[in-house]
Amino acid sequence: MDLSGKMVKQVEILSDGIVFYEIFRYRLYLISEMSPVNIQGVDLLEGNWGTVGSVIFFKYTIDGKEKTAKDIVEAIDEETKSVTFKIVEGDLMELYKTFIIIVQVDTKGEHNSVTWTFHYEKLKEDVEEPNTLMNFCIEITKDIETYHLK
């Protein structure tokens, strides 16, 4: 059986899409301020903010449980306003062989959106789809928007 999967979710946002893109590209460290219930820390371990190859460490809480993730920024695309993160260590690696998260911001006039895409390979057949993580990412998106609409 194929253990690979893909999950995509798009969220319409009212705030400026460019601001969202800049946060995910250059200012990830601000997310813990914008979504403190979900994200407790974002630390740069290697490289520079906003550059491919940078290593970032996240401390987060999902379903009341404290978790961690060490990510490498795999790709940045200015044209499509997307940032690709490959998770290399942390709690998700107990369930998945590979896990890649792509955050893409679509800025078309007044209609902006954020699209979260997961590409993953489960370690075992009985591992659940990452719906809880996707809902968590949507919550963070809403928290960032609320912060900017204040």
Swiss-Prot record:
> Which controlled-vocabulary keywords does the entry list?
Acetylation, Allergen
Source species, domain of life: Eukaryota
CDD domains xrefs = Bet_v1-like (cd07816)
Q: Name one GO biological process term.
A: defense response
Q: How is it modified after translation?
A: The N-terminus is blocked.
Q: Which SMART domains match?
A: Bet_v_1
Q: Which residues carry this modification: N-acetylmethionine?
A: M1
Q: Which family does the record assign?
A: Belongs to the MLP family.
Q: Quaternary arrangement and interactors, per the entry? A: Monomer.
Protein name (database record): Kirola
Source organism of the structure: Actinidia deliciosa (Kiwi)
